[in-house]
A protein has these predicted regions:
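Beta-rich, blade/repeat-based domains predominating
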Residues: 9-32, 49-64, 68-70, 91-105
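Short loop/turn segments that connect beta-strands within beta-propeller blades
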Residues: 1-2, 37-41, 77-81, 121-125
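A short beta-strand motif characteristic of beta-propeller blades
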Residues: 2-9, 41-48, 81-88
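Loop/turn residues immediately N-terminal
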Residues: 31-34, 70-73, 113-116
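Blade-level signature of beta-propeller repeat domains, shared across WD40, Kelch, NHL, RCC1
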Residues: 94-125
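Hydrophobic "anchor" residues
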Residues: 3, 43, 64, 73, ...
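Short active-site-adjacent structural elements
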Residues: 73-75, 84-85, 92-95, 116-118
Length: 125
């Protein structure tokens, strides 16, 4: 029963968002979305987002929704492509951590200072 450091790597700079999969963690930091293998501790960058990542949620298809504090919400694909879904920064609405309900295709985004949770129903084009 001893506490010890599990991972200490400079690539994980200012970590904030975290999402647990079966065999790895998905980490969002001040710039990158990356994975960390739970057995080997090996880090792999998925995407260069360029700014701080707050929320991370899986879509159940190998992609990840991410949010940042300024109000952007995006979908990140396995090869690193980033599709911006929402930008609420002009309305001064932050995007905090988020949650995706796969069975209902609903993305929940707490807005922090706006004092509400917004639910978005995702519909295929």
């Amino acid at each position: 029963n001893e506490v010890s450091i599990w991972l200490d790597d400079k690539i994980v700079s200012k970590p904030n968002g975290i999402f647990a999969e079966d065999t790895y963690l998905v980490l969002g930091n001040s710039r990158f979305l990356e994975t960390c293998d739970l057995k080997s501790n090996k880090l792999k960058i998925i995407a260069d987002y360029g700014k701080g990542i707050d929320g991370i949620a899986a879509d159940g298809k190998g992609n990840y929704f991410i949010s940042d504090w300024s109000g952007n919400t995006s979908l990140v694909f396995p090869k690193g492509e980033i599709l911006q879904l929402l930008d609420t920064s002009k309305q001064n609405i932050n995007a905090a951590d988020l949650c995706y309900i796969t069975e209902k295709n609903i993305l929940l985004i707490p807005t922090f200072f706006d004092n509400r949770v917004i639910a978005y129903k995702l519909i295929k084009d």
